[in-house]
Amino acid sequence: DVVSFERLAYKVFEEVGEDNLEVLDDTGKNLIIKRVLEQNKDRLKYFGSNLSNTGFVSEMKSVISEMLQYDIKPDVMQDAAGAAYSDSEGSAALQYKLDDIVLVYNAFAEYIDKNYITKEEILDKLCSKVTESERIKNCEIVFDGFTGFTPVQYNLMTILLLMCPKIYVSLTIDASERENSVRGREELFFMSKDCVSKLYKICDEEHVKVLEPVYIAGKVVPGKNVIVNVNSRFKNSEELDFLEQNLFRNNSGRFNKKTDNIVIYEGAVAKEELTFAAGEIIRLTRLCGYRYNEIAIVTADMDGYGKLAANILKQNDIPYFLDYKRHVTDNPFIAAINGALGIIENNYSYDSILGFLRTGMSGMEREDIDLLDNYCVAVGIRGRGKWHEPWIRKFRGTVNNTDLEKLNSLRTMITDMLDPLEEVLKSKESNVADMVKALYEFLVREDMEQKVSVLNDSEYTGDEYAQLYKKVIEVLDKMYALLGSEKVGIKEFNKILASGFQEIKIGLIPQTNDCVVIGDIERTRLDNIKVMFFVGI
């Protein structure tokens, strides 16, 4: 089997009868962290004023996730906070930040205790159960594609070293390097060497025999056990092979031949870079026999280059796939949900009502929205009371009885839409489960799934909108399951829901196999690429 650490854990849990775990994902963590932040906001020394900042909950979630992943306990952070305080040159702000992180971490852990585990804790659980697995005891395990391991992963590997007949670890390192000699973080292969050093230390402490390292290289290296691989990936490109051998090396050489496989182009702006890339792609596919799926555009700045690259390729009729998961809080559907809740929270303020109507999800025609807008401004319609009583006032003789009849019809359309939701959200008897159910019924009543399914604009495709509706329902399901019995006000309910929406990301799969991939230099995995454009360097 080829599995990730997480998938290995689930296979072991299934074998040993530990497969009923409730695992908390990032959205669930966001929801709970937002709740505990609101509960403890008066106790926060530093972050109290940050609670309403966009992205703050996700940042706090990331900190807690890293603490879990690297097995950093709250008492370690508490000691660090104390050290910051006792240091004469220490920062009080740093101490307060660490104190706040510990407070939120402990509150989060207490909330999920005995009911859920986070995905970062899955390997901890695996460490306690893997020795019960008969299947693992007879396995030879190969760890491939890693540059290093987290402390929890090293703990698991320690257990596996004592259980399994053989374990292989493949790492990237030059055959001329000393694999167990770590001089500094600035070394080219520091991460691989550091990993080897830690594994050697574990083997030494556990009295595990280490076999002679095997290198796969393009040539024999004296004193090393080398398997010579003559089928180098750069066998047809002398300059790329030279670049690999000399890039970031202390004693790098100079390539004095003509370079056919490396081209440097400088554009004044991003659009110029990408226009050049598009022209080259057209030339390569039409004149040189390349397929689109053999070409990729890679950048470290997907926000600045991804969408622009997609637009330029589209203009040139070049099929592409944008490998990019993005946040979706800036679309009409999310805006409509926030708008409807905002109307109730803000007592039918002018801005909240018009903001909701302008999303295009209310079912009201644009001309009717303009008519409402003009009347509300001219007559001064403000507050829930005004919206729940008949409008009879005319202004400047421009509104006749027919217009008033139309306006009142539009008024009742809005109040009838929101009243059932408002009744539940403002009831002192309602808990989060009741509020989530009322919001879901609002979405169903207003046929939001159908409205979302026909959306397709310059920002999002129809397929992305289809994903979005399902993701929103998943957030509601998680709120219902994780926070259902909690009692909160409408303001806090809206904040918790917004924190869940912040974690929603959508992405697509390629519509065709033959397309240019536009991807991130860290995230995107590329296979069988023959031409690569690095942009935004």
Q: Could you describe each region identified by the protein language model?
A:
Residues 1-537:
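Polyanion-engaging groove/track-forming segments
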